[in-house]
From Swiss-Prot:
It is found in: Mitochondrion outer membrane. This is Mitochondrial distribution and morphology protein 10. Component of the ERMES/MDM complex, which serves as a molecular tether to connect the endoplasmic reticulum and mitochondria. Components of this complex are involved in the control of mitochondrial shape and protein biogenesis and may function in phospholipid exchange. MDM10 is involved in the late assembly steps of the general translocase of the mitochondrial outer membrane (TOM complex). Functions in the TOM40-specific route of the assembly of outer membrane beta-barrel proteins, including the association of TOM40 with the receptor TOM22 and small TOM proteins. Belongs to the MDM10 family. PANTHER family: MITOCHONDRIAL DISTRIBUTION AND MORPHOLOGY PROTEIN 10. Keywords: Membrane, Mitochondrion, Mitochondrion outer membrane, Transmembrane, Transmembrane beta strand. It is a multi-pass membrane protein. GO terms for cellular component: ERMES complex; SAM complex. InterPro entries: Mdm10. Component of the ER-mitochondria encounter structure (ERMES) or MDM complex, composed of MMM1, MDM10, MDM12 and MDM34. Associates with the mitochondrial outer membrane sorting assembly machinery SAM(core) complex. It comes from Candida tropicalis (strain ATCC MYA-3404 / T1) (Yeast). Lacks alpha-helical transmembrane segments, suggesting that it resides in the membrane via beta-sheet conformations similar to those predicted for other outer membrane proteins and porin.
Amino acid sequence: MYTYMEYLQKCFYKSTNWNEDNIFSNITATSQAILEFPIPNGFKIDSSSKTTDYSASSFTLSNNHQINGSLAYLYSSVPLKNTMGTKDVSLQDAIAGFRIIEPMVRLQPKFNNKAPHSKSSLLYGRMYFPGSALEAMIIKRISENTQLLIKCVNNPHLSKNGTMIVYLQNNTAKYSREFIYSTNESLIGLRCLYNLGTPTSSSTVSSFNPRTIPKFDNSVVSIGTELWFATRSMSPGLSGALRYSTRSTSTGKPLTMTLAINPILGHISSTYTVKTSVASTFCSRYDFNVFSYASNLSLGFELYSYANKKRSDFYNHEIYSSSEENKYLKQHPELQKHHRVPIRAYKHHDNRTIINPIHNLDNVYHINPTLLSTTSGSGHTSETVTTAFQNLVNESDFSSVLKFSTSLNDKVVKILWEGRLRDFLVSTGVKLSLNPVTNTPEFNKLGISFSYAL
């Protein structure tokens, strides 16, 4: 679960059209969210408030062997009007999970020159107690595609009482570049990510003809690398990664595959993540070392639960009521008795109207061939199905999510439940491992955290 400050940072990126998925460090973010999710340790409560559209504060208190706390502040030069509190926020926005990688879109130059957020900035600071540990972050947008990110940590337990990392990031539809410098070991780094294919213009997206778009436009292939060099210890670092993300043209379900290689350490890691339904995701990862021949297989899944267990009978349709349908029922109480909502027509970008092209709008997605064109508009069919699936995921009203991951070689099992309890977001989980001596399971982590934000 994201902290409230992390959530505001993501809203800042969305408000300023900054694509996080186009950064090399996030190339395996989907598999990490399902396999390497953190488990709360002890008891923790977080209370946050957005005083204005430009500023917010957060207070955290935890009890893990001793009482600790922190106080944080955030300021944004861009009004964060698209944020919500823990009572109304969607779980898809509050919890790290499957990321749908969108095809590349190049903004028009005239839009870039007049963009009001081309010089936007974000300031963040946190103070921990007891003790004198501090952390800060500055995000300064230099241009529409370039920003400066500075992270600082001040802690008496660190070498020279702290460290600072500077990122100069350039993010475009075709590629992204990062120049990194850290005061720790005087580390210098370079990250690059290149997207194969030709980016689509934003004007083309708003007025495209689906017959002219091939099916592979739903796929995104990205290849990247990172180079590191510690000037003090004269130690180099090198790694590369490949990501392939696509969506099925028949069901609209997305999947992501990645391959990461570290030639210096001889480590190879491959992942496969697929959204098997609107409310479930499965992920697998295989790690192998060419020097030691050590290998490991990790498996994980996440399963969402709907807030409203009653299904809505859409004549021949059977889906869980999304937030949009719930709003419609509130406006028309006479329909609540039978839980029936009229089927709304889907309007495509070229102003053609399609009346419900999906026969059974459930997690399986059965296609009704009598309602789909069998002529040259096959590209239109695939575009409609993928859009319908994504809209259904975004509009679904979920109340909780259950995450599970295990590793065969490490013999570790992690279980995490995150959901909404009244006005709070709750996260609780456990981490179990097998004792190598007694071969009995033992608890490594066990905790619960509460988050409240206005």
